[in-house]
Amino acid sequence: MKPPVRVAITGAAGHVSYSLIFRIAAGHMLGKDQPVILQLLEIPQAMDVLKGVVLELEDCAFPLLHGLVCSDDVHVAFKDADYAILVGARPRGPGMERSDLIQANGPIFTTQGEALSAEANPEVKVLVVGNPANTNALILLKNAPYINPRNITAMMRLDHNRALFQVAKKMGCHCSDVEKMVVWGNHSASQFPDISYAEIAGEKVAKGVENNWHGDNLIPIIQQRGAAVIKARGASSAASAASAAIDHMRNWVLGSGGKWVSMGVYSRGNSYGLDEDIMFSLPVICEDGDWREVAGLELSSFQRAMLEATEAELQAEREAVADII
């Protein structure tokens, strides 16, 4: 059996992590032959709840779980981490604007970036889940000088998975049959779910749907899906977010099998003329523990306008935290 790897998880007593941690311990993320040591971080006032999660983890007797670390100290939780999934973030409170939320999360991700850079494996792979994920990831990146910017990512896989299902539902097929789906930009209502390249069995999806379905149906459904979940269940997406995090990390580590996936990545060197200092969701292919951009796709004027709109939002978010990056 392989030697165990260390997986750090922040916000470990929260709803998303409750759906995430047990799946990682069961081998769903890194494979059935990869033992893990879970390093769980929480704020002091949630440590008692985290103890309950640990009791349940112990009671599962997972063969792949080779150790547990629980702490409210980032330096302890991130020590020698090979993977870090940053779920914890300041939630949006009543009357808070998005800009307020971004600024409130700034100190959290500044501290975590510094600690990861100091304590983690230098090749640590980082996924930021806590919202606003793209700009939180940018803050982290700017405060983690010893981590390769390519190894810091923001989660767009939930949006990607949502789009796969909606396209499959429309086309009467299984979501695993849909290929070359792309979600561009920010994890927000400005994101751009794009079917321009999507295929099912080699046939273009765009040819099989009404001309207005993409703009009038798919795009708003995906952009507002998170709000629809909150309205229906009275809480934000948890199990689906955890599943998306598993998918993101599994493909990044083990490969995406040649398939396109959407990942929020540092935009430096991108082939689409985008601002080179934001965390922007691009189509990528994962192989050999790395990702590469699907470069040079042809863009229509509509696509370009959609990319520019979400790019502008990310630029505004960056400006809101300019003093800490």
From Swiss-Prot:
Q: Give the keywords, sorted.
A: NAD, Oxidoreductase, Tricarboxylic acid cycle
For biological process, the GO terms are: malate metabolic process; tricarboxylic acid cycle
**Residues at which NAD(+) binds:** G11, A12, A13, G14, H15, V16, S17, N105, Q112, V129, G130, N131
Gene Ontology MF terms: L-malate dehydrogenase (NAD+) activity
**Which Pfam families does the record associate with it?**
Ldh_1_C, Ldh_1_N
Which pairs are disulfide-linked? none
Q: Can you tell me which residues bind substrate?
A: R92, R98, N131, R162
Q: Does the keyword NAD apply?
A: yes
Q: Catalyses which reaction?
A: (S)-malate + NAD(+) = oxaloacetate + NADH + H(+)
Q: What is its EC number?
A: 1.1.1.37
Q: What class of enzyme is it?
A: oxidoreductase
Q: Quote the catalytic residue positions.
A: H187
Instruction: Give the family from UniProt.
Output: Belongs to the LDH/MDH superfamily. MDH type 2 family.
**PANTHER family xrefs:** MALATE DEHYDROGENASE
NCBIfam families from the UniProt entry? MalateDH-SF1, PRK05442.1
- Report the function annotation for this chain: Catalyzes the reversible oxidation of malate to oxaloacetate.
Entry protein name: Malate dehydrogenase
Q: Which organism is it from?
A: Desulfotalea psychrophila (strain LSv54 / DSM 12343)
